[in-house]
Amino acid sequence: MAQVKRIRRNVSGIILLDKPLGFTSNAALQKVRWLLNAEKAGHTGSLDPLATGVLPLCFGEATKFSQYLLDSDKSYETLAQLGKTTTTADSEGEVLLTRPVTVGRDDIEAVLPHFRGQISQIPPMYSALKRDGQPLYKLARAGEVVEREPRSVTIARLELLACEGDTARLSVDCSKGTYIRTLVEDIGEKLGCGAYVAELRRTQAGPFTLAQTVTLEELEQVHADGGNEAVDRFLMPSDSGLLDWPLLKFSEHSSFYWLHGQPVRAPDAPKFGMVRVQDHEGRFIGIGEVGEDGRIAPRRLIRSE
């Protein structure tokens, strides 16, 4: 007997998941996608299995804007284990080196200024970056080490929250592409004792905070009680991650032409940059870019939600 193909639902929006420990970002995404029975899904940048916290999951039309969330700043809290280095720069790797820990709070506070502002990082081998189409972590698992180009990142804030024994808890605000494992490892080297990430929690991604997240257990319970559609109440609008962008409201006439790919003018448009656009009925219809001629060109269009 032929298996009946599951018909997925066309749902759109963003769910802010508090990613559980031990899950890859994709595994968490696929689990929530199954709970929603959503046709299209994507996440906004990976969190290591070791990490927990804010993971925006995009569904349907919201996937068109996931890149802009990927490019946003992030905030983390991390527990650094001092005195050891590992192959992965976190607790999941094998210990490479053990050194005595003779530093205290004052020593840690003294080195942190070296890691604030614009700094250079060499991405870890255990990362999703690719070399000739192959993820670096796969090469690392095969025992290969390849040269990686340093990358410039910005550490907007780096604070020591607590220091107890051979651990230090840090709070970090950083730009996209920052590797907290590398940051902790570099701090450990500066201290002379080495360090790795024992715990990592993302507390903010772009405009989204932990207070807005929902746990996988909560989603599973709601699904068990009410099915796929009951989970819809956790969906935020597709433009939720873009609320700090200028908002333009088009007339019915302008909306028609813009949705057909034509640049249009708006009297209240900024002189340059990206904008959110609503139609004459207040529906989000996409994002645009203000050109040199003052017209707003469509960049990503959305079907009415």
From Swiss-Prot:
Disulphide bond pairs: none
A GO BP entry: mRNA pseudouridine synthesis
Record has Ribonucleoprotein as a keyword: no
NCBIfam families: TruB (TIGR00431)
Protein name per Swiss-Prot or TrEMBL: tRNA pseudouridine synthase B
EC numbers for this chain: 5.4.99.25
InterPro entries: PsdUridine_synth_cat_dom_sf, PsdUridine_synth_N, PUA-like_sf, PUA_sf, tRNA_psdUridine_synth_TruB, tRNA_sdUridine_synth_fam1_C, TruB_C
